[in-house]
Amino acid sequence: MECSPTERILALFDLMRDWFDSKNFYGCVFINAVAEHEKSNGWIQEVANSHREKITAKLQAMVAASGAQDPEMVTEKLNLLIDGTIVTAMVTANSEIAHIGKLAAGDILRNAQ
């Protein structure tokens, strides 16, 4: 079954919920590494930023394919939402936050048309 770009973006939050429910969920290794080390430790931020750039490029391609008016801004909003969803799930140990994130992502995508 073929999914629309919007459905693919929203499905990311379903995947996150599965990840949050797994016994091996400890948050994002990149967020954790940057948070736990000195800001002067540039190589950790370089690795994290490299990962983020790759993920952002893939997400922005999906956002552009969804017909969003400003794919770059919409992608930044979604990145912020994804990061917040991951951190909140880690802090609260509540995988339901992924559903709330999915609803918010739907709002962002609808408003971007």
Question: What are the functions of these language-model segments?
Answer:
Residues 1-22, 65, 75-78:
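Hydrophobic alpha-helical connector segments
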Residues 2, 20-24, 41, 89, ...:
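A general structural signal marking secondary-structure boundaries and capping sites
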Residues 13-16, 30-34, 78, 82-85:
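Short alpha-helical scaffolding segments that buttress acidic/His motifs in well-ordered protein cores
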Residues 22-40:
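Amphipathic alpha-helical segments used for helix-helix packing
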